Amino acid sequence: VISAVEMLRAIGDGTMPDFTGKRVAVIGGGNVAMDAARTALRLGSKVDLFYRRSLEELPARREELDHAVEEGVTLHLLCNPVRILGYENPDDPRDPKNGSVRAMEVIRMELGEPDERGRRRPVEAPGSEFIWETDCVIMALGTSPNPLIKNTTEGLAVNRWGGIIADEDTGETSLPGVYAGGDAVTGAATVILAMGAGKKAAQAIDQALQKTP
């Protein structure tokens, strides 16, 4: 079991284990999930991606999704893994496979009422559990801003989802001289958008410093 970010970082470092011939399950529906799925596929594995909502709610850019499917990633929509099952050899406690992933327990979902963001909430379909055999699980689930930032920064305005409120053009927050951008402001998005926000903030900071006596 590995996070998508850890996996992609390992690829860059050249330390990723051999995926050749393995069955890989990716959990998530964002752009990072697509990156992880396509990367694992190119490393020689069979990749299945599980997302608990429908195609309409899937947050990844459609271009990323289309490329993943074209390359051979299999989608399992309205499917939510709830438990990872490990391998254990009762006859040999020293078996090197002990503790490795052998399968996931997955439950099928149905769409219920919309949540606060307007997306219909996924609810479990009773009695729909099934076992999916896999050799590796890549977790590519959404993240939220570190609550430590808002909890330790007095006067910093945040929205109801915990994102920092910042000026769209300058990145300046409710605290003069404090700037923010990227996922901490917008929620899950792309690296390109985060880089753009950083550039705008840098320009605003430069202008502010030039005006400082």
Question: Where are the predicted features?
Answer:
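General small-molecule cofactor/ligand-binding pocket signal
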Residues: 2, 74-76, 105, 179
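FAD-site-proximal beta/loop scaffold in flavoenzymes
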Residues: 2-22, 115-188
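A structured beta-alpha segment of the ubiquitous adenosine-cofactor-binding alpha/beta core
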Residues: 13-15, 78-135
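Rossmann-like NAD(P)H-binding beta-loop-alpha module
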Residues: 16-45
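Cofactor-binding loop segments of dinucleotide-utilizing enzymes, especially the Rossmann-like FAD-
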Residues: 29, 52-54, 183
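A conserved FAD-binding loop/helix module that cradles the flavin
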Residues: 36, 181-212
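Rossmann-like dinucleotide-binding cores of NAD(P)H-dependent redox enzymes
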Residues: 37-83, 213
